Swiss-Prot record:
Pfam families in the record: Steroid_dh (PF02544), TECR_N (PF21696)
Tissue occurrence: Expression is highest in the heart with very low to almost undetectable levels in brain, skeletal muscle, stomach, pancreas, liver, kidney, small intestine, and uterus.
Organism: Mus musculus (Mouse)
Protein known as: Trans-2,3-enoyl-CoA reductase-like
PROSITE patterns per the UniProt record, alphabetical: S5A_REDUCTASE
Compartment(s) of residence: Membrane; Endoplasmic reticulum
MF term (GO), any: oxidoreductase activity, acting on the CH-CH group of donors
């Protein structure tokens, strides 16, 4: 009995000693499988923090400039939006007004806001009030220039080539044309062909628009004066200049000189220097025709007036003289206006210069 009891106790001890070993084996096996699962899943992915945008939106109230009544409200306008973007949204709300005929003012009677101006630059708060004015039917500036310059070219060509249809046939065949008539035709064509080519390939024409009434006024001015000049110069009874060929040759050379200078100045204005502190100020280069920049702020107008003065002396006709006087007055006003802008921006460069005529104007 004692031996049997002892053997039972021995079996119990062996049984209790065997249980932890099997449990440890199972735990090790489970840990191994878990580690294999983690390794096969790959590295843990880091979650990126979501940034909430704090973009400020403006609400623009558009009122009629005359009646002060509300037309519409343009909302959800961002800080980087421009006046052009506001016009686009205004056009969607009111389709009868397309963007080119929309004029927006910050205050009644103030200047119209340019398309490139940002909304943030004119905003005093999140709510902005703008005044709307209908600018009427608009035309692109390239169309305006092409219409104004192509008309004189074709009109003068008609008077020169079809004189028998305009004047008396007997007088046209009786009186031979003076050489200055042919030279005037050549110079006139050179002038307007240059303007047309520069409009298409040289000038950086603004993307803005001009009212239709300005196109009509410009065409009436250029076309009307060209018809008057061409009628007198190509008339069978046209009287040549008083000093003969000497007057014609000198004025023709000066005309071509001014035309060349005008072209080179326009080329410089279209491709300004972008180095130095005067990045936007037009400056002369190695070309002698551009050295007029040392004396005046707007040498292109100076050369233009010089061309028409030379044409007046060459043809010695009243219509050309009147046209030259009117062009001189108009270009002087343009030059003085541009000269004031240059003085505000680049006073150290233009304070000793004249606007259009050296030492005079």
């Amino acid at each position: 009995m004692f031996k049997r009891h002892k053997s039972l106790e021995r079996k119990r001890e062996l049984l209790f000693q065997g249980l932890p070993q099997s449990t440890m084996k199972n735990n090790a096996r489970n840990f191994h499988s878990l580690s294999q699962l983690v390794l096969s899943a790959g590295p843990l992915k880091t979650t990126t923090a979501v940034k909430h945008s704090k973009t400020t939106h403006f609400e623009i109230e558009i009122l009629d400039a005359h009646t002060r009544k509300q037309i519409c409200i343009v909302d959800k306008v961002t800080q980087t939006s421009t006046i052009h973007d506001v016009k686009q949204k205004f056009h969607k709300a009111c389709p009868k007004w397309y963007p080119s005929r929309i004029g927006l003012q910050l205050e009644y009677g103030g200047p119209y806001l340019r398309d490139y101006i940002t909304v943030q630059s004119v905003a005093a708060s999140s709510i902005i009030t703008l005044y709307f004015t209908d600018l009427g039917q608009q035309v692109g500036w390239t169309t305006v220039f092409l219409a104004e310059y192509s008309g004189p070219l074709l009109i003068y060509l008609l008077f020169y080539l079809r004189s028998s249809y305009i004047y008396d046939v007997k007088e046209s065949t009786r009186w031979p044309r003076h050489p200055v008539v042919h030279l005037a035709f050549f110079c006139h064509c050179i002038h307007y062909i240059r303007l047309l080519l520069e409009t298409l390939f040289v000038h950086k024409v603004s993307t803005g628009h001009s009212p239709m009434k300005n196109l009509i006024k410009g065409c009436a001015f250029y076309w009307g004066f060209t018809s008057w000049m061409a009628y007198y110069i190509n008339h069978p009874r046209y009287t040549p200049p008083s000093f003969g060929n000497r007057q014609v040759i000198v004025s023709a050379i000066n005309f071509l000189f001014c035309e060349a200078g005008n072209h080179f100045i326009n080329t410089v204005l279209a491709h300004p220097n972008h180095t130095g502190s005067n990045a936007c100020f037009p400056s002369p280069n190695y070309n002698p025709f551009t050295w007029l920049f040392f004396l005046v702020s707007c040498p292109n107008y100076t050369y233009e007036i010089g061309s028409w003065i030379s044409f007046t002396v060459m043809t010695q006709t009243l219509p050309v003289g009147i046209f030259t006087i009117l062009m001189t007055i108009q270009m002087s006003l343009w030059a003085r206006k541009k000269h004031k802008i240059y003085r505000k921006k680049f006073n150290s460069y233009v304070h000793r210069k004249s606007a259009i005529i050296p030492l005079i104007l």
